[in-house]
Amino acid sequence: VGKNGWQFEEVYEEIQQKYLQKKVHILGYLSGKSLVNLYNLAEAFVFPSVYEGFGIPPLEAMMCGCPVVASYSSSIPEVVGDSALLIDPKSAESIASAMLKIIKDEELAEKLTNKGLQQAKKFSWEKSSKELLNIFKSL
């Protein structure tokens, strides 16, 4: 889901070469409602980003009650806290292992869902703007 990013062509070529078109769906941009529906249908949200300025997609998934598997790099650990399984974004084994844990362990999936909902409550545009205003006032 989303716009074509870094190394998209290589990933797309790999999908074609390995005949994975029926298993890997490249959806492009989705509207808010469609995205929420997708999060609600998913067993997990996997976000193996190597670089991320903030980490809005994992936060969106947590807000929708979707367990998260995310990269241990960049700002993502700070955003997800202990409410996600953190993985090495360059290791297929690490990603697959975390995905299998969530799929096979309903208790873990439920725990991550509940923690994710709580973690997501810590973030809002209103809260961020108030904190920024307080910083400016203190200068």
List the model feature ranges, each with a label:
Residues V1-Y12:
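Glycosyltransferase donor-sugar binding loop
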Residues L85-A92, K101-E106:
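Conserved acidic donor-binding segment of nucleotide-sugar-dependent glycosyltransferases
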Residues S94, L108-K122, K130-N134:
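A short, well-ordered alpha-helix in the C-terminal region of glycosyltransferases
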Residues Y29, L38-I56, M63-P67:
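Acidic donor-binding loop of glycosyltransferase active sites
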Residues E10-V36:
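Nucleotide-activated donor-binding/catalytic signature segment of Leloir-type glycosyltransferases, i.e.
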Residues V50, M63-V80, P89-A92:
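Short glycine-rich donor-binding/catalytic loop of glycosyltransferases
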Residues L100, W125-L139:
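C-terminal alpha-helical cap of glycosyltransferases
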